């Protein structure tokens, strides 16, 4: 393969499982991009390369000896720096927590590891996840990989920028009022804010108990679907987490949207949007309708 860092998460995981590429090759390809561009983009604020390389080698050994592999086996990732890992740095984007090392590990991080993925570092974010642009006075602003003077969107700024810049194949973010959706949009990638209670929030810095969600940012919707299959599900350590069975989200991506009704507000939605944004939205609606969805336009009171 010419550029393994350009693979989607699903392509990368499948390539490792088939032996077409090794995990260490994926990791080093991502690091080449990171070393070249992170000084300008500032998406990654700390790394543990030694541990990540050890995890990659262990993943490759598992493939060689034909152990059962998880859905994300051998894929390097990173996380918004508000996910806790026991003994690891978790700054939450603030000088107040510049040396905070929690004693617990987030359920989502553990589930990703059980599926074979490994994280190599913490990603830039708005301080305590509290602004929509991704600016940060302590660790420096995160910049949009496509146009450095532009914002990445926040608060999961490093999550959006790192995936777009091909520093990793997916990143974990959080969304209280748009903090997965905004960076995904601004950085041109795919992001998913799950229905609240679908994914455990245990071990993730709380911002708003009634609004917080955690979820993936990746290159494709299929990538997000595979991650959701791994991280969703009840967690006894998060009493708000739902008990409904977790489907295989990826297998349900048939493209058939019959029976789905999509509401599109005619006000308070695209009122102040630039013309290209409106055009992109309308083009997306045409695609969705072509797949069988019913588009219902309505006015908000």
Regions found by a protein language model. Give the residues of each.
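Immediate post-signal peptide segment of exported/extracytoplasmic ligand-binding proteins
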Residues: 59-75, 223, 253-263
